[in-house]
């Protein structure tokens, strides 16, 4: 009779880069003692495309189609940060209507991103049904995007000084209908998921991050707010016109995977509130501002001198980025998305440093999975919400 051999030594397992629950081309080298995780080393770089270097050889308007490939599930945010940086450098005033349209698009994009987090996260821990439900609502968001921008994904909609096109006729009514419908959808998710005993068994108390830990690791977004810190850049930085709307920052105290789920569910409802207020109060007026005032040039006494240049919508060289440094950030669905921009009196940026939320949030993964079970890696990694396009850039 053959006696099964038992191994006493540690086992090293490669998870990814092709594993379906890796959310892209992430590779984890996991050291196991039976089912217990002893060590975990993430290997990055499989999706590196040199996004920062490409930016240094493009004007901002030429670079806009590239940025939607960072976080390809929340493309409006990457576009927003790309146009916000030169707007602040050039002191460009965005018309009120354009600002409202931007907020609506950003919040719709946040909902689409959270939906496509929720489905695969539930599939990772064994619940297949919500994966199909979320596509029903996400499809409606993409229909709205397609009607307004012409593209379902990779919209290329934001422009320096405004947006590419105004909202089409009937779009606002269609969006209001979606808001009413989506609230019933969220209630359905909560009924299906939140009190499910198997779900709670898998997420409650798994991957706990304390307040000090969250701050020291530089976490942001739902990862930070699930640990009891009420930090949302929409409230902190007062960008666009978020101050004009009534909404609450979503947060939880426990810091586990369940808290991160609850924060994101709450954020989807808060986003609907913001969208409804923006749609009801959207002002008239232009949707773009095509001129930039030049305050840094000496006055020329000639009679026909213009003190402003026009911002081109074509991919030709636009205005020069003045010689200064600037850090701009927005509250993306995954956390703080930032750009460190150095201008050099040139149409190209001298340096374009991207601060992706996923890359920084992912750093805490090895610490969270140590002394946990192998199956908990999926739960913890899923609750972080990463997209490898922005991690590897």
From Swiss-Prot:
One of its GO terms (cellular component) is chloroplast thylakoid membrane. It is found in: Plastid, Chloroplast thylakoid membrane. One of its GO terms (biological process) is photosynthesis, light reaction. One of its GO terms (molecular function) is oxidoreductase activity, acting on NAD(P)H, quinone or similar compound as acceptor. It comes from the Eukaryota. Its EC number is 7.1.1.-. The keyword 4Fe-4S does not apply. InterPro entries: NADH_Q_OxRdtase_suD, NADH_UbQ_OxRdtase_49kDa_CS, NDH1_su_D/H, NiFe-Hase_large. The keyword Cell membrane does not apply. NDH is composed of at least 16 different subunits, 5 of which are encoded in the nucleus. HAMAP family: NDH1_NuoD. This is NAD(P)H-quinone oxidoreductase subunit H, chloroplastic. It comes from Vitis vinifera (Grape). The gene is ndhH.
């Amino acid at each position: 009779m053959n006696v099964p051999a038992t191994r006493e030594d540690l086992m090293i397992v490669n998870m990814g880069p092709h594993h379906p629950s890796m959310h892209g081309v992430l590779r984890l080298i996991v050291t196991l003692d039976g089912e217990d995780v002893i060590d975990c080393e993430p290997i990055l770089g499989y999706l590196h495309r040199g996004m920062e270097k490409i930016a240094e050889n493009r004007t901002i308007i030429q670079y806009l189609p590239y940025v939607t490939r960072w976080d390809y599930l929340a493309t409006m945010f990457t576009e927003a940060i790309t146009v916000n940086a030169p707007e602040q450098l050039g002191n460009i005033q965005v018309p009120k209507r354009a600002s409202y349209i931007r907020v609506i698009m950003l919040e719709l994009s946040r909902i689409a991103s959270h939906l496509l987090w929720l489905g695969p996260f539930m599939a990772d821990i064994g619940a297949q049904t919500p994966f199909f439900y979320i596509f029903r609502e996400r499809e409606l968001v993409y229909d709205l995007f397609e009607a307004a921008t012409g593209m379902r994904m990779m919209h290329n909609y934001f422009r320096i000084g405004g947006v590419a096109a105004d909202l089409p006729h009937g779009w606002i009514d269609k969006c209001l209908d979606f808001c009413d419908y989506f609230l019933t959808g969220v209630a359905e998710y909560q009924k299906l998921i939140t009190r499910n005993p198997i779900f709670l068994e898998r997420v409650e108390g798994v991957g706990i991050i304390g307040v000090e830990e969250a701050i020291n690791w530089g976490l942001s977004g739902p990862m930070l707010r699930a640990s009891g810190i009420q930090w949302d850049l929409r409230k902190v930085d007062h960008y666009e016109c978020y101050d004009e709307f009534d909404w609450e920052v979503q947060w939880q105290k426990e810091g586990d995977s369940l808290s991160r789920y609850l924060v994101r569910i709450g954020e989807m409802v808060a986003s609907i509130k913001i969208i409804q207020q923006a749609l009801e109060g959207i002002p008239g007026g232009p949707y773009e501002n095509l001129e930039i005032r030049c305050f840094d040039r000496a006055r020329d006494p000639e009679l026909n001198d213009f003190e402003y240049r026009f911002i081109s919508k074509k991919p030709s060289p636009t205005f020069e980025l003045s010689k200064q440094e600037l850090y701009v950030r927005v509250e993306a669905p995954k956390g703080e998305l930032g750009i460190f921009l150095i201008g050099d009196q040139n149409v190209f940026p001298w340096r374009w440093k991207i601060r992706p939320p996923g890359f920084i949030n992912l750093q805490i993964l090895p610490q969270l999975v140590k002394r946990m079970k192998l199956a908990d890696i999926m739960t913890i990694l899923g609750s972080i919400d990463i997209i490898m396009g922005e991690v590897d850039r």
